[in-house]
Structure formats: structure tokens, C-alpha cells
């Protein structure tokens, strides 16, 4: 599979031969959906909580006698049927949302996303991508000069200047190649990969 190699101005300078295993895989929408959904589910912290009838701070005294009042019978004010009562099936803070995805499926899903990005001309390779200092303005000007607005940049190792420069740009995300995830790949309309990062990706998928 041939990928575009861009220059500093964002113009195609040449092409680069890339691994077919990583960039020529058929797109499997069901697999990609499963991988992305599982990744998002595994990131959930499970911090929501509700109270059941046994946890409500109300008296357990019977509100009124069983018969003769004309009301429906009631045992206690914390009943889920009453206003202010407990919830019948409360959410628990230790609820487990994790979904299991086999390593082979995960790798196939990521490869399918990368292949689709390459086919849609949304993925390109750059020799090097860096800024001289940790300044948001420098990175914003660099991306504007390349005609890029919303972009995911995948680098070979963490470039501190580049990472710090990107933090105030809400449509820009800089990731080390080892931190690349399927959600980030599908979220951005454009993906830039450095040559060093591409080599590490191909090595990992051999």
C-alpha cells in the first residue's frame, strides 16, 4: 500500500510503501464498532450510585394500619412505590462495564481503521513533525500552513514541545505511537504519522 509523504508545507512530496497487513485490510464495520465500543466501555469508571430501599434514611414504621383506611396497603415509607423511596434496581458504584476483546480482534480492528483512513486519503506520513518551543502559536501556525485544522498526530516517542503546544488546541491531539487507540483514530478527520512511528507500527504488526 502506498501512502503520501508530505513536506513541511503539507504538500505531497513523494510516496512511501507501507505494510499491506496494516494498510490494505478490508473494512469490517461490525468489528470496528465492537472494538471502539469495548474501548469506551473499558474506560468507564463506574462512579454512579443510587440508593435502594434499605439505604434510604426513612423510618421502617408502618405508615398506617393495614385495613380500613381505603388506601393501598403500605409497609414503610422507603418503598420504591412512594415518592422519596428507594430505587428498585439501583446503580452501584462498583458496577463493572468492561468488555473483553481478544488481542487478535483488537489488532484487526485497528488495522481496518488505518486501512480505511488510507483509502479515504485521510492518513499521511511526514518525515518529522516538531516545533522549536512549547508554544501553542507555533503549532497552530504550522498546522495552518499545512492546511490542517482537526488532526491526530502520531509520533515516535513523546516530543515534549509538541505535546505541550497541542494542549490548548481542542481539535489537535498528539499521541505517542504506543498510545494510539481506535477511538482517537476514528474521531479525527485527518491523521499524521511520522516515519519513525510508522516503522514501529509496522514492526508491531508483523
From Swiss-Prot:
Primary gene name: rplD
Keywords in alphabetical order: Ribonucleoprotein, Ribosomal protein, RNA-binding, rRNA-binding
Superkingdom per UniProt: Bacteria
UniProt similarity note: Belongs to the universal ribosomal protein uL4 family.
Pfam families reported in the protein's UniProt record: Ribosomal_L4
GO cellular component labels: ribonucleoprotein complex; ribosome
Residues covered by region (Disordered): 47-94
SUPFAM superfamilies with a match to the protein in the record: Ribosomal protein L4
Subunit structure and binding partners: Part of the 50S ribosomal subunit.
InterPro entries in the record: Ribosomal_uL4, Ribosomal_uL4-like, Ribosomal_uL4_dom_sf
Keyword Ribosomal protein among record annotations: yes
Protein name in UniProt: Large ribosomal subunit protein uL4
Gene Ontology molecular function terms on file: rRNA binding; structural constituent of ribosome
Gene3D superfamilies: 3.40.1370.10
PANTHER family (UniProt xref): 50S RIBOSOMAL PROTEIN L4, LARGE RIBOSOMAL SUBUNIT PROTEIN UL4M
UniProt entry tagged with the keyword Ribosomal protein: yes
GO biological process: translation
The protein's role, per its UniProt record: One of the primary rRNA binding proteins, this protein initially binds near the 5'-end of the 23S rRNA. It is important during the early stages of 50S assembly. It makes multiple contacts with different domains of the 23S rRNA in the assembled 50S subunit and ribosome.
Amino acid at each position: 500500500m502506498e501512502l503520501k509523504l508530505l513536506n513541511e508545507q503539507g504538500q505531497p512530496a513523494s510516496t512511501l510503501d507501507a505494510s499491506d497487513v496494516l494498510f490494505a485490510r478490508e473494512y469490517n464495520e461490525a468489528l470496528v464498532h465492537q472494538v471502539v465500543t469495548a474501548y469506551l466501555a473499558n474506560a468507564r469508571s463506574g462512579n454512579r450510585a443510587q440508593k435502594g430501599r434499605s439505604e434510604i434514611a426513612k423510618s421502617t414504621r408502618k405508615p398506617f394500619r393495614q385495613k380500613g383506611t381505603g388506601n393501598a396497603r403500605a409497609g414503610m415509607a422507603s418503598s420504591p412505590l412512594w415518592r422519596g423511596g428507594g430505587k428498585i434496581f439501583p446503580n452501584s458504584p462498583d458496577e463493572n462495564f468492561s468488555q473483553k476483546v481478544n488481542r487478535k480482534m483488537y489488532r484487526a480492528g485497528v488495522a481496518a481503521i488505518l486501512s480505511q483512513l488510507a483509502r479515504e486519503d485521510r492518513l499521511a506520513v511526514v518525515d518529522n513533525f516538531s516545533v522549536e518551543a512549547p508554544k501553542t502559536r507555533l503549532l497552530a501556525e504550522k498546522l495552518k500552513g499545512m492546511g490542517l485544522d482537526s488532526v491526530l498526530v502520531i509520533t515516535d516517542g513523546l516530543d515534549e514541545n509538541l505535546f505541550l503546544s497541542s494542549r490548548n488546541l481542542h481539535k489537535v491531539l498528539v499521541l505517542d505511537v504506543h498510545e494510539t487507540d481506535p477511538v482517537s483514530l476514528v474521531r479525527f478527520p485527518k491523521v499524521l504519522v511520522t516515519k519513525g512511528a510508522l516503522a514501529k507500527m509496522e514492526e508491531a504488526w508483523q
